[in-house]
């Protein structure tokens, strides 16, 4: 028996363990959708799947609670599939290898899926438990949140109805979120005709790894290094001083994760090899100094490899490296009226160059529409000047905070009564689905909260066990004390 099954509350953790056994990376949700539909039938609640792939449950009010405001419980079913470079794991087939480490639940070499698996299993536990007190409940478990909030965007009017939305996708217990940033994807592409490499040159594979990475909204203001940006600094110098040519570039693999690793293959004249190898060591030390106390495990190495036949033409190489080097990345500015809360940022998430094609993906976030457009226009200019075709997609507005929210007032009072302290009220610099769902179901009073998770979207992701009990107890109390209509 897995040790997770003995954790409290057991009815939550048993469902989480079941979830870890079912592959559910974004874009491959058939198995989890079937599982959730079957679960709904087994526990006797109305359940169905809509055209966007979302799963919906409906549970009637407890007798005597019919006069309470109707609540929508909301979470997303997909997870970010990230693994360490040397971890053997197929996210479309393999279960997540979970284990308990003190007060934390972790995975071995992969993302854990507590984002947003903990929200899903809290919903499952509530749907299953016939002893709870609550008003009319609807559960909305959305599809493909991590890759573009496609389930939320595909939700049609009339599919779900309610007066209160409790989003269970926040990651710090004791915090209530009343607003979030909007976002927009930018993709720059280019096709080019490759040139032959110089047969006298030497090929080197240069690898950067060991960075912390993280969620490109929540952790963008923490000062974590971006692997693509560091590699651009290296490339800029070896092109200028060592006659380096570029064969390929692979950095990052998720639009909403700060890239932790990057690998390029370059060619240089034989006379420059030792200088380049020495410079690799110098770069590692410089970056360790620059990111002291933030990035403790930077590894920057180079090794000789077989000489490829083809490479990126010189002019294209220069344009691409210059654009990546100049591309705005990280925090643009903080919200002037809310201390320490990022307003606008962007993440140079993915760079793929090789075999005659280049593709670069950036995700920009902002709680202010004008600043989101400003930042993405600057990024678009960088890549347009490099001769790339640039497309924007998936734009969504933020969720405007309402400090006078009735459910906010009720939940603050409930939390204080339960735990003897007042929860923090915040705005999050990440894309929650609340704003999108709120546009489909007008008039919703919305709050987002959840248990404590650390390092989501990375193999270091972990979930704090004691916080899960507090989160679940608070959720049950919120449902029991939902305001009357």
Describe each region flagged by the PLM.
Residues 219, 226-228, 233-249, 401-444:
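Active-site-adjacent substrate-binding region
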Residues 3-103:
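Acidic/His- and Gly-rich active-site-bordering loop/insert found
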Residues 65-147, 152-163, 203, 318, ...:
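Active-site metal-coordination/substrate-binding segment of hydrolases
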Residues 74-76, 140-142, 165-169, 207-209, ...:
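Short beta-strand segments
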Residues 341-430:
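Substrate-recognition/cap regions that form aromatic- and gly/pro-loop-enriched pockets
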Residues 224-241, 268-273, 318-325, 332-333, ...:
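His/Asp/Glu-rich mid-to-C-terminal helical/loop segments that flank catalytic regions of hydrolases
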Residues 12, 336, 343-358, 422-474:
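Zn-dependent metallopeptidase/amidohydrolase metal-coordination segment
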Residues 23, 95, 103-106, 146-147, ...:
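Midchain, well-structured core segments that form catalytic/ion-binding scaffolds
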């Amino acid at each position: 028996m897995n040790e997770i099954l003995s954790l409290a509350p057991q009815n939550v953790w048993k469902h989480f363990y079941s979830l870890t056994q079912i592959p559910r990376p974004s874009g491959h949700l058939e198995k989890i959708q079937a599982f959730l539909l079957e679960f709904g039938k087994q526990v006797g609640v109305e359940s169905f799947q809509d055209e966007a792939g979302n799963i919906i449950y409906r549970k009637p009010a407890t007798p005597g609670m019919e006069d309470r405001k109707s609540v929508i419980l909301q979470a997303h079913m997909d997870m970010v599939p990230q693994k360490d470079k040397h971890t053997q794991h197929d996210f479309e087939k393999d279960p997540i290898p979970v284990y308990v480490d003190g007060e934390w639940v972790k995975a071995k070499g992969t993302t854990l899926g507590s984002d947003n698996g903990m929200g899903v299993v809290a919903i499952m536990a509530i749907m299953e438990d016939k002893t709870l007190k609550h008003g009319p409940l609807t559960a909305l478990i959305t599809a493909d949140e991590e890759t573009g909030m496609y389930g939320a965007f595909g939700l049609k009017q009339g599919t779900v109805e309610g007066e209160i939305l409790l989003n269970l996708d926040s990651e710090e217990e004791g915090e209530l979120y009343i607003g979030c940033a909007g976002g927009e994807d930018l993709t720059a592409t280019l096709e080019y005709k490759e040139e032959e490499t110089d047969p006298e040159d030497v090929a080197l594979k240069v690898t950067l790894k060991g960075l912390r990475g993280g969620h490109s909204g929540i952790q963008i203001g923490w000062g974590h290094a971006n692997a693509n940006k560091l590699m651009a600094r290296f490339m800029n110098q070896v092109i200028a001083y060592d006659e380096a040519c570029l064969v390929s570039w692979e950095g990052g693999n998720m639009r909403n994760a700060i890239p932790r690793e990057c690998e390029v293959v370059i060619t240089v004249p034989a006379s420059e090899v030792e200088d380049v190898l020495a410079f690799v060591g110098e770069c590692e030390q410089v970056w360790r100094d620059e990111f002291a106390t933030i990035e403790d495990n930077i590894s920057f190495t180079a090794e000789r490899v077989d000489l490829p036949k083809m490479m990126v033409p010189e002019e294209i190489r220069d344009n691409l490296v210059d654009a990546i080097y100049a591309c705005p990345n990280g925090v643009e500015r903080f919200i002037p009226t809310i201390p320490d809360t990022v307003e606008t940022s962007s993440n140079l998430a993915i760079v793929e160059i090789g075999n005659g094609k280049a593709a670069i993906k950036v995700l920009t976030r902002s709680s202010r529409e004008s600043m989101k457009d400003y930042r993405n226009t600057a990024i678009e200019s960088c890549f347009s000047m490099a001769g790339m075709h640039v497309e924007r997609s998936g734009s969504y507005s933020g969720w405007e905070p309402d400090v006078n929210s009735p459910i906010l007032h009720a939940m603050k009072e409930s939390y204080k009564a339960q735990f003897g302290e007042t929860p923090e009220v915040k705005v999050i610099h990440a894309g929650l689905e609340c704003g999108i769902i709120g546009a489909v179901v007008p008039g919703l009073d919305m709050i987002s909260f959840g248990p404590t998770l650390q390092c989501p979207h990375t193999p270091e992701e972990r979930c704090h066990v004691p916080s899960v009990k507090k989160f679940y107890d608070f959720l049950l109390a919120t449902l029991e004390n939902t305001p009357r209509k």
